Amino acid sequence: MKHIRNFSIIAHIDHGKSTLSDRLIQVCGGLTDREMAAQVLDSMDLERERGITIKAQSVTLDYHAKDGNTYLLNFIDTPGHVDFSYEVSRSLAACEGALLVVDAGQGVEAQTLANCYTALEMNLDVVPVLNKIDLPQAEPDRVAAEIEDIVGIDAMDAVRCSAKTGVGVDLVLEEIIAKIPPPVGDESAPLQALIIDSWFDAYLGVVSLVRIKNGILKKGEKFKVMSTGQNYNADRVGIFTPKEKDKTELRAGEVGYVISGIKEIHGAPVGDTLTHAKHGADKPLPGFKRVKPQVYAGVFPISTDEYESFRDALNKLSLNDASLFFEPETSSALGFGFRIGYLGLLHMEIVQERLEREYNLDLITTAPTVVYEVIMNNGETIYVDNPSGLPALNNIEEIREPIVEANILVPKEYLGNVITLCIEKRGSQTNMVYHGNQVAVTYHLPMAEVVMDFFDRLKSTSRGYASLEYNFIRFDPADMVRLDILINGDRVDALAMIIHRSNIRHRGLALVEKMKELIPRQMFDIAIQAAVGSQIIARSSIKALRKDVTAKCYGGDVSRKKKLLNKQKEGKKRMKQVGNVEVPQEAFLAVLKLND
């Protein structure tokens, strides 16, 4: 066991995690040069297109070190984006150490900090690596000082490498062996294996990635899942090199996969412990903290007959994405669908895109809302994640909105823009620290504002240099109201939103104007109104299309024309009473894009 090293790679977006992992695989001969593709571990098409890592992936490599021994390296490539931080904490639970990769040109960013603190809290050894030293703008000494100053770990003798050109990658491997401790565990103890990740394979059933903490899991043995108490047979065990490679057993300290033909989707939940069916361990391993969804949105299939396949797709996806939450929902405008809870807007986009791609569904999403805490007049507390579930205002004592603590790292010259943006988003500043050229500011902001478009606006006001990391801290009382859209006096439930009272005029007008552009003209007038309770705050009308009924009168008496016009008027009146307005799908999407 002293020749095993388990580590993960953590870094901010675009600091070169995936490229560095490619190099490590190449140096250790995990794949032949012919099989090497850029970003080997980003296996989803979506990951490659966007250039981001979404799912953590694991690889086991053999490394012949300079001290003459052969070491077994298990490493896990992790996502860098704030929405996927739970993936990072899951990966770190399986490791003894982490490589903190920092771009020698960009320096420390907020996400680097957040992931690094997660690693330090889990008592992992953090090894700093300065990447991209081949760039002309690289300043390794300044960045090393910055790491010491902001993160507080010793970085003066940090390894300097360039994952792109391959310079210094062997030094990184030597550093891993020197600085990261071997795993502790007892091979003779009862089996305890932590499930780090699972996914569903159409042929094999559920495939689980496990880290063996104690004991040995042999091929063909019976094991049980501790949370459900179900027993299964380990049909295949093995490691990823990144290709699947079957083995006869997985020993304590190793990371590998188990395939046992589990067909029910939640048979082996992530964070669970496996043990032997007979003479197993008594206690499960401490799992991960369940992440609570921060943002909810209704998602509906465009054609109602896709509902069943939509449900199956969500079940399969939630196995692979442990943070997804969903429950059935119906809407008078959109039919049957699900209310889905996400970790953030990027997560929401990715989930929708994965559903559309991997399961061939056509979906429509309503405007996202955060969870509000509502105190009723009778003293009970309810949590509302859907605008249509908000009780009438006269029954409510107060509404409390979720507040996040946002840590923003920004170069000095853009500080003014960032502060202006935070004030506009109803934020209050709690802290500001200067680190050389960077400033770390801490703001308390309403989550609803952060969720909408804060990240994009932050990037554009700072030319992409500011970086953001946030977490939920508390609920605060706020003057929130529900804005309804009425079309010819009928509320459209899918367009309702909960917003702050200071924004209603501006938001209501913008929405009404947008709807006016998108709803096609009918044979009768359509009134579009924005209302809060019974008070109408904005209105716009779509004029009726009309046929020129007097065209066939040549000259003649005016009373003849009047008669025809009046007859038309009567018809329009009747039509308006019975006619209903189809709201096109673009209109629902427009609500999401209102701020663009």
UniProtKB/Swiss-Prot annotation:
Gene3D superfamilies for this protein: 3.30.70.240, Elongation factor 4, C-terminal domain (3.30.70.2570), Elongation Factor G (Translational Gtpase), domain 3 (3.30.70.870), P-loop containing nucleotide triphosphate hydrolases (3.40.50.300), Translation factors (2.40.30.10)
Enzyme class label: hydrolase
Domain of life assignment: Bacteria
Membrane among keywords: yes
GO MF terms held by the record: GTP binding; GTPase activity; guanosine tetraphosphate binding; ribosome binding; translation elongation factor activity
Entry's EC annotation: 3.6.5.n1
SMART domains per record: EFG_C
Residue ranges annotated for the tr-type G domain, each copy included: 2-184
Keyword terms, alphabetized: Cell inner membrane, Cell membrane, GTP-binding, Hydrolase, Membrane, Nucleotide-binding, Protein biosynthesis
InterPro entries on file: EF-4, EFG_III/V, EFG_V-like, EFTu-like_2, G_TR_CS, LepA_C_sf, LepA_CTD, LepA_IV
Catalytic activity as recorded in UniProt: GTP + H2O = GDP + phosphate + H(+)
Pfam families per the UniProt record, alphabetical: EFG_C (PF00679), GTP_EFTU (PF00009), GTP_EFTU_D2 (PF03144), LepA_C (PF06421)
Membrane topology category: Peripheral membrane protein
One Gene Ontology term from the biological process aspect of the record: positive regulation of translation
Binding of GTP, residues: D14, H15, G16, K17, S18, T19, N131, K132, I133, D134
Protein biosynthesis among keywords: yes
GO cellular component, one term: plasma membrane
Subcellular locations according to the entry: Cell inner membrane
Similarity section: Belongs to the TRAFAC class translation factor GTPase superfamily. Classic translation factor GTPase family. LepA subfamily.
Job of this protein: Required for accurate and efficient protein synthesis under certain stress conditions. May act as a fidelity factor of the translation reaction, by catalyzing a one-codon backward translocation of tRNAs on improperly translocated ribosomes. Back-translocation proceeds from a post-translocation (POST) complex to a pre-translocation (PRE) complex, thus giving elongation factor G a second chance to translocate the tRNAs correctly. Binds to ribosomes in a GTP-dependent manner.
NCBIfam families attached to this UniProt entry: lepA, small_GTP
Name of the protein this chain belongs to: Elongation factor 4
Species per Swiss-Prot/TrEMBL record: Shewanella frigidimarina (strain NCIMB 400)
Taxonomic classification: Bacteria, Pseudomonadati, Pseudomonadota, Gammaproteobacteria, Alteromonadales
GN (gene name): lepA
